[in-house]
């Protein structure tokens, strides 16, 4: 679940099965993020955006941004920066029970022009400096139908690896 906090008030509370993404729009400047995990500073990023992904979403935007592919049975949350302005910004793998708070900040005294948060690429909300995105494990459980005989790794090989089904 993702919650947007603006001026100490919750403005949105939306679920996401795959990912929650904060990204700049168009030609806006990079965004500064202060990321807290369980109330402790994890890191500060200057980047085009940040992806918070579930294992189910790890083969989508997260993978394209250089994040790891994770088995859907893993109980983790992925944090992947998008085009970070840094020499050492890797994806991080956190526990599914970790509470993630992302603070949107100005970069080097410049004004953030436009940034948005999207939930599974469907619903978008505009963000401003000072806003906080809270990401928590949802209490809702999604039941996913699995075709018998297909393993995660076989499907991964076919869809992401570009191999045909006979291999």
Which stretches of residues belong to each language-model region?
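Catalytic phosphate-donor-binding core of small-molecule kinases
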Residues: 1-51, 59-167
């Amino acid at each position: 679940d993702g919650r947007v906090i603006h001026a100490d008030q919750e403005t949105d509370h939306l679920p996401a099965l795959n990912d929650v993404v904060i990204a700049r729009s168009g030609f806006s400047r990079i965004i500064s993020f202060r990321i807290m995990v369980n109330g402790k500073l994890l890191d500060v990023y200057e980047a085009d955006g940040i992806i918070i992904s579930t294992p189910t979403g790890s083969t989508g935007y997260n993978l394209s941004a250089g994040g790891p592919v994770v088995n859907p049975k893993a109980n983790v949350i992925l944090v992947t920066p998008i085009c970070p302005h840094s020499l050492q910004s890797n994806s991080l793998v956190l526990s599914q029970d970790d509470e993630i708070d992302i603070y949107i900040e100005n970069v080097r005294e410049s004004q953030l022009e436009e940034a948005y948060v999207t939930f599974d690429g469907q619903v978008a909300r505009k963000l401003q400096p000072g806003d906080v995105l809270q990401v928590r494990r949802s209490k809702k459980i999604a039941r996913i139908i699995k075709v018998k005989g297909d393993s995660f790794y076989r499907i991964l090989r076919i869809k992401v690896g570009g191999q045909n089904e006979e291999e």
